[in-house]
Amino acid sequence: METKKYGLGTTAIHAGTLKNLYGTLAMPIYQTSTFIFDSAEQGGRRFALEEAGYIYTRLGNPTTTVLENKIAALEEGEAAVATSSGMGAISSTLWTVLKAGDHVVTDKTLYGCTFALMCHGLTRFGIEVTFVDTSNLDEVKNAMKKNTRVVYLETPANPNLKIVDLEALSKLAHTNPNTLVIVDNTFATPYMQKPLKLGADIVVHSVTKYINGHGDVIAGLVITNKELADQIRFIGLKDMTGAVLGPQDAYYIIRGMKTFEIRMERHCKNAKKVVEFLNKHPKIERVYYPGLETHPGHEIAKKQMKDFGAMISFELKGGFEAGKTLLNNLKLCSLAVSLGDTETLIQHPASMTHSPYTKEEREAAGITDGLVRLSVGLENVEDIIADLEQGLEKI
């Protein structure tokens, strides 16, 4: 399929499909650990990479290949590598491109496990990590060194949905020809933003979220050029992490991607109406959403994103107790971590995900006592708003 001729929705449905023996419409699940060779000579050629074909599911599987082809087409990259989680994608990538003595510049605002990998994981193996605000190009410029191998960031970032100018950042980072720009595009997805087209070298995803969209799979994906993808597959994934995605999970994601575009349209449409409600509510101090003109990254988001997404953070005036009260009185919204599901998910970081931390530690990470994170789902938006309204009345 010539994906460039088609729209995003068509690409998500049709890209990367492989013909199979029986001509099935749905992609078969090739539930096998290993593959049979016609001869010893063929086995030798495949291990020597002289002949295309499958060897062992840790190295590749037809069902997983279809998923990889689809996301590569959506992100407009040359190739992709599927992993068993978003952290598997991030770890497999970093363990491929980094070595002792290298330097990483990354953002202060990161997904918690990514932050832990940067702060406690990489540094154990002789890799230096500098944390900056990547939306401030002067900070990035001042942090970079001759041995800076990676600039890593999320945009929009968690929890305040900070926006980074990817085109400007990539241009700055590439003044060092050895530096790779890696972007976690989980929040935006290729529906809204394509970092490779804006100058990034590698894109990573937690496919658990919007791309699968149904809350029933843990998976990750890496998208980049063919050379780097091969290195990540045969070094970082095969030898370092072993974070291989199984064909059953790959099938679920392929199925989920068939509704990717229409789901994202509904997510974004619902979120705008929820933001409008929250922004006017007297018990809310502040709403973080890149679609608001008051958001510091609004103009950049308009420039590099097709839409503003379905993630919202807001601060309650009543602080810690107000956050708990709101969540404990909701009837429709689900109290759960993660995001990008059909259901609306809500969490209060101070009393949930970040409860082991002190107040000072939370605030250093941008998490105030009254901060609430909302992943707007696909329910009728009037029902989402009504549930939030009745919950807020209890504060």
UniProtKB/Swiss-Prot annotation:
Keyword Coiled coil tagged: no
Cellular component terms (Gene Ontology): cytoplasm
Source domain of life: Bacteria
Catalysed transformations (reactions): L-methionine + H2O = methanethiol + 2-oxobutanoate + NH4(+); L-homocysteine + H2O = 2-oxobutanoate + hydrogen sulfide + NH4(+) + H(+)
Positions of substrate binding: Y111, R373
Modified residues (N6-(pyridoxal phosphate)lysine): K209
EC number: 4.4.1.11, 4.4.1.2
Keyword vocabulary terms for this entry: Antibiotic resistance, Lyase, Pyridoxal phosphate
GO biological process terms on file: response to antibiotic; transsulfuration
Names of required cofactors: pyridoxal 5'-phosphate
Function noted in UniProt: Catalyzes the alpha,gamma-elimination of L-methionine to produce methanethiol, 2-oxobutanoate and ammonia; methanethiol (methyl mercaptan) is considered to be one of the main causes of the oral malodor associated with periodontitis. Also displays homocysteine desulfhydrase activity, degrading homocysteine to produce hydrogen sulfide, 2-oxobutanoate and ammonia. L-cysteine and S-methyl-L-cysteine are poor substrates for the enzyme.
Family: Belongs to the trans-sulfuration enzymes family. L-methionine gamma-lyase subfamily.
Note in the entry: F.nucleatum strain ATCC 10953 is able to grow in medium containing 1 mM 3CA.
Subunit structure: Homotetramer.
Protein name per Swiss-Prot or TrEMBL: L-methionine gamma-lyase
Species of origin: Fusobacterium nucleatum subsp. polymorphum
Classification of source organism: Bacteria, Fusobacteriati, Fusobacteriota, Fusobacteriia, Fusobacteriales
Recorded name of the encoding gene: mgl
